[in-house]
């Protein structure tokens, strides 16, 4: 078996290497997930989120690439947990790739069983966009993070975070977006991170302003910026399970508090308190059970500190990494006393079919993205909030790998935008086709009772039919590749979710596929929330003419 890191070819430009643009897009996006500017550990095929991978191993990666290069326009490649297992003759409107990652029968859906299978080389953790080949670096989460903190500001601080301090932890692929999202909302952020390389990476990509390894210096800088009403983000080298209790000890209580460490995966995503990175790596190899025990104890202390800060006035929320569940399992009974970010701040957007819609320039030329920015500013000029986001993104966000953009578009808006982009490709206004996709964290594509579907109005938090329906609908609609994953964001046993990607290659056939997929995909999100009894979703379904046979 080939286990050695291979150099990954970053294909750009308008020259085809595969037999069609959809296969080419899948190849370029797979490789983009492993681009050194994008992936957390490309040498291990790890893209983000603990051990979220793009392919099971290097042998599988090589076979996927070879298959995509030779895949016909009426064939479909099947990927089973990062391994290419079959190619079948289908038809030209069918997806070119169907992906199923990390799916386990519910009674076996534990990290222990997953790790057993992983050791045997039988499974891979796909996270959300790692194994579905549509990760675009920290920008992929930054608008969602910006929207979350904007809603925190609206609910608690009069519409701005100016004059407030946010404390959080974790500066990996997801958490790395937090400091920029806070400063874009005018606030001050102290982001605790145990790995100095991750802090430096966020400084290099302008997601973070400065760093220190001293708590007193971080607090001093934060307080000064708060008093002066300035936006500032500070990376603090340390372990949150140690830093937060010290903050309480010295009487420092932040205005806003959250966390985006990879607590969903205690073995690979959380460093136990009192250990260096090297000591942690050694223990993880030597005695994984002891490592997990120590990591879970640290997570419990971390959550206890969050609860203590909440009691002293911090606006506190879980940012979707299942940290509350891990702490509760460790005996922290009050762990769920602070809410998850979706029910607290994001669900109204889901009711309108809005979610993290993204597009990528396969040409590799930033100008293609800037031209699409102009389309948003022109065609959606009545949406001031959206236009402000696009202007800020152009100014503040550095591309990682292939140039990309993200913005939250809803039902009707996505299909409209998709047609415009396809027309631009057809007219030669863009140098190559555009890939359109989204996070699995979307309005109708995930069942995750501790995150996206926490506290549903009708109690349907754990019903996983919706993401399965979403994947089926996207496949029959003609998405370019469709994925069904388990355990993304919150870990084994806690979520089922689906992804879709569709290519705008300028053809009339693509125009029809885009119209279908970019209507039904967010449409199911509206349906899922209307079915659960949300008035805004019911209103949206009626206004948009979405046919729900039992909607009163």
Swiss-Prot record:
InterPro entries: Urocanase, Urocanase-like, Urocanase_C, Urocanase_central_sf, Urocanase_CS, Urocanase_N, Urocanase_Rossmann-like, Urocanase_sf. It is found in: Cytoplasm. Pathway: Amino-acid degradation; L-histidine degradation into L-glutamate; N-formimidoyl-L-glutamate from L-histidine: step 2/3. GO terms for cellular component: cytoplasm. Pfam families: Urocanase, Urocanase_C, Urocanase_N. Signal peptide: none annotated. It is an enzyme of class 4 (lyase). The active site is at 407. Catalyzes the conversion of urocanate to 4-imidazolone-5-propionate. Belongs to the urocanase family. This is Urocanate hydratase.
């Amino acid at each position: 078996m080939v286990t050695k890191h291979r150099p990954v070819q970053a294909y750009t430009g308008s020259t085809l290497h595969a037999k069609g643009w959809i296969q080419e897009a899948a190849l370029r996006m797979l490789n983009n997930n492993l681009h050194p500017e994008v992936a957390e550990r490309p040498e291990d095929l790890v893209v983000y989120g603990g051990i979220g991978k793009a392919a099971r191993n290097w042998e599988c990666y090589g076979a996927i690439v070879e298959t995509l290069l030779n895949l016909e326009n009426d064939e479909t490649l099947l990927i089973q947990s990062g391994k290419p297992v079959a190619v079948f003759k289908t038809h030209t409107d069918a997806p070119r790739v169907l992906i199923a990652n990390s799916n386990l029968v519910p009674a076996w859906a534990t990290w222990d069983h997953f790790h057993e299978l992983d050791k045997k080389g039988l499974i891979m953790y796909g996270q959300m966009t790692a194994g579905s080949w549509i990760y675009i670096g920290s920008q992929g989460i930054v608008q969602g993070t910006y929207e979350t903190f904007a809603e925190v500001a609206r609910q608690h601080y009069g519409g701005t975070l100016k004059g407030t301090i946010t404390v959080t932890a974790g500066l990996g692929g997801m958490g790395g977006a937090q400091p920029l999202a806070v400063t874009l909302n005018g606030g001050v952020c102290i982001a605790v991170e145990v790995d100095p390389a991750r802090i430096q990476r966020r400084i290099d990509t302008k997601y973070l302003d400065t760093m220190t390894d001293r708590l007193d210096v971080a607090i001093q800088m934060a307080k000064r910026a708060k008093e002066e009403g300035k936006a500032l983000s500070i990376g603090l080298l340390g372990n949150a399970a140690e830093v937060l209790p010290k903050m309480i000890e010295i009487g420092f209580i932040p205005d806003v508090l959250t966390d985006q460490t990879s607590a969903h995966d205690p073995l690979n995503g959380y460093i136990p308190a009192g250990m260096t990175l090297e000591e942690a790596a050694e223990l993880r190899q030597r005695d994984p059970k002891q490592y997990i025990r120590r990591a879970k104890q640290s997570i419990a202390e971390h959550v206890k500190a969050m609860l203590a800060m909440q009691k002293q006035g911090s606006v506190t929320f879980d940012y979707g990494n299942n940290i509350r569940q891990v702490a509760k399992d460790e005996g922290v009974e009050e762990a769920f006393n602070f809410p998850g970010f979706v029910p607290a701040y994001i669900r109204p957007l889901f009711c309108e079919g809005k979610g993290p819609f993204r597009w990528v320039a396969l040409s590799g030329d930033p100008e293609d993205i800037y031209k699409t920015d102009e389309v948003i500013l022109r065609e959606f000029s009545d949406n001031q909030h959206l236009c402000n986001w696009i202007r800020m993104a152009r100014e503040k966000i550095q591309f990682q790998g292939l140039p990309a953009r993200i913005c939250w578009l809803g039902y009707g808006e996505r299909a409209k935008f998709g047609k415009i982009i396809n027309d631009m490709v057809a007219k030669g206004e863009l140098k190559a086709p555009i890939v359109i996709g989204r996070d699995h964290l979307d309005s109708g594509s995930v069942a995750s009772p501790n995150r996206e579907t926490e506290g549903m109005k009708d109690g349907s938090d754990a019903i996983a039919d919706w993401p399965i329906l979403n994947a089926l609908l996207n496949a029959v609609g003609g998405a370019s590749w469709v994925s069904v994953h388990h355990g993304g964001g919150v870990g084994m046993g806690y979520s089922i979710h689906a992804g879709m990607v569709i290519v705008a290659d300028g053809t009339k056939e693509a125009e029809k596929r885009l119209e279908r997929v970019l209507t039904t995909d967010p449409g199911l999100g509206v349906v899922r929330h209307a079915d659960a009894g949300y008035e805004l979703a019911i209103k949206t379904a009626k206004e948009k003419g979405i046919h729900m046979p039992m909607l009163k």
